[in-house]
Design a protein with these regions (language model features):
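Bacterial N-terminal signal peptides that target proteins for export
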Residues: 1-12
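Post-signal peptide N-terminal segment of secreted/secretory-pathway proteins
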Residues: 77-79
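C-terminal motif of bacterial Sec signal peptides marking the signal peptidase cleavage site
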Residues: 19-22
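Extracellular beta-rich repeat passengers
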Residues: 27-71, 83-93, 97-99, 103-204, ...
Length: 432
């Protein structure tokens, strides 16, 4: 690992000569405050801390090796250059515990930030990955010269804590071989805490779960060019309070589950197919998106409750490929107590009617128009997940289980009720 404090006088002089404006938000230099700048690249092989009173710059791909713990203080700002990214290997840990008033922010080091400016953040654990020998799978999205094999048999594996964290302008998928998206969790175990995380303006997939048993809570995905919340290869965790907003970027889906015909779950090779349990999810699409708001395919299973699927100009729900359709017919893949409010709510396949399946009265789902979503309109770029007075989604929910993870008091459909305090104070929505 290379850690080198930069000379602030040189940095500030260069910024001034370049005529760059807005440096307070881009370079972590607050008005009246000069923070030391620390450049980081390569391997971290021992316990290391990144401090809030400095600006950390990822000049290359940073790898936390097995046995080491990377601690990031609340309020720390991490800037990434084009080749920058962070990988936490199996047996390593990250303790990134921000707070509502002092979130940890990973963002672009560019003066004019844009989606895809840098690679992203990867947690690689030792929990099972479906269809892989021994539950282990080499990662296929790493830059040249960097290797990692994720997965294993430790379902309760602990990769650390990722709490009150924003990841912005990541997911580079051009010019460089392989992109992890914004935030990728591969083979991450249930001992890992992922709570209050925003992934914003991503060039590829925003949040990607590959295998593992990790559970996630208070997740906000805003603006992305591929899939918002993606799972495959045997993810069997839980999730609650998940908001996915395509915004003004032309993406594909809000949720994509399964890997299509390449999915190990499709041919019976895998012994632990994807089977998440989700409550309180809001998916907000856009008029010109490429796919349905929810695309369920491959051999995925899963149970989803209290979902608000809204405003896609294409469709709300598509269940593709025979194995996923078979799982749906057998009750292994299910959506209940949910609302679909899109221009066209269902994609019916030749041998499977998503509309008949979803609107079976036993499922207690509702088929509404896009104008009946109960969500306020976007104003000045702000993103609202709270429900308007009288919204259909304020009734008809089923209580989540009281199991120590879920909040059973969330008696509304979607990620938020009439107010949305859990996504306020630590989130941000910069265009550049």
């Amino acid at each position: 690992m290379r850690v080198r404090p930069a000379h602030l006088g040189v940095v500030l002089g260069a910024l001034g000569s370049a005529g760059v404006t807005g440096c307070a938000s881009v370079f972590g230099i607050e008005e009246g405050v000069l923070r030391p700048i620390v450049e980081v690249s390569g391997s971290i092989g021992k316990d290391t801390t990144w401090y809030a009173d400095q600006t950390t710059i990822l000049t290359g791909f940073v790898v936390v090796e097995a046995g080491a713990t990377l601690t990031i203080e609340p309020g720390t700002k991490i800037l990434a250059q084009m080749e920058g990214g962070l990988l936490v290997k199996p047996g390593a840990r990250i303790v990134a515990r921000g707070t509502k008033v002092a979130p940890i922010v990973f963002t672009s080091a560019a003066s004019e930030r844009a989606e895809g400016d840098w690679r992203g953040v990867i947690l690689c654990g030792r929990a099972p990955i479906n269809g892989a020998p021994g539950g282990m799978r080499p990662m296929d999205v790493l830059p040249p010269g960097i290797q990692a094999t994720c997965g294993g048999t430790a379902e309760d594996d602990d990769s650390g804590v990722f709490e009150f964290v924003r990841i912005e302008f990541a997911g580079r998928n051009k010019d460089l071989p392989g992109s992890p998206g914004g935030f990728r969790l591969e083979g991450v175990g249930s001992g890992t805490v992922v709570d209050h995380v925003q992934v914003h303006r991503t060039e590829s997939d925003a949040m990607d779960l590959r295998g593992g048993t990790v559970s996630v809570k208070h997740i906000l995905v805003t603006m992305y060019e591929d899939d918002g919340f993606d799972w495959a290869l045997g993810w069997r965790g839980k999730g609650q309070f998940i908001g996915v907003v395509m915004g003004n970027m032309q993406g594909d889906t809000g949720i994509q589950a399964g890997q299509g015909t390449s999915d190990a779950e499709i041919d019976g090779a895998g012994s632990a197919p994807s089977d998440p349990l989700l409550y309180n999810v809001t998916l907000i699409g856009m008029e010109d998106q490429y796919g349905p708001n929810i695309k369920l395919r491959g051999g995925t299973r899963g149970r989803m409750f209290d979902m608000l699927v809204a405003r896609a100009g294409t469709s709300g729900l598509g269940i593709e490929e025979a194995p996923a359709q078979k799982n749906a017919n057998e009750g292994l893949l299910d959506i209940r107590h949910s609302i679909f409010a899109n221009d066209d709510n269902f994609v019916d396949e030749p041998n499977f009617s998503a509309s008949d399946w979803a609107m079976d009265p036993a499922r207690n789902n509702r088929d509404l128009s896009a104008s009946e979503s109960g969500l306020p309109l976007f104003t000045n770029g702000a993103i609202y997940l709270s429900l308007v007075t009288g919204a259909e989604a304020l009734s008809g929910a089923v209580a989540p289980p009281d199991d120590g993870f879920f909040d059973p008091s969330a008696l509304f459909v979607g990620a938020c009720g009439p107010v949305c305090p859990d996504f306020e104070g630590w989130t941000a929505f910069p265009d550049r």
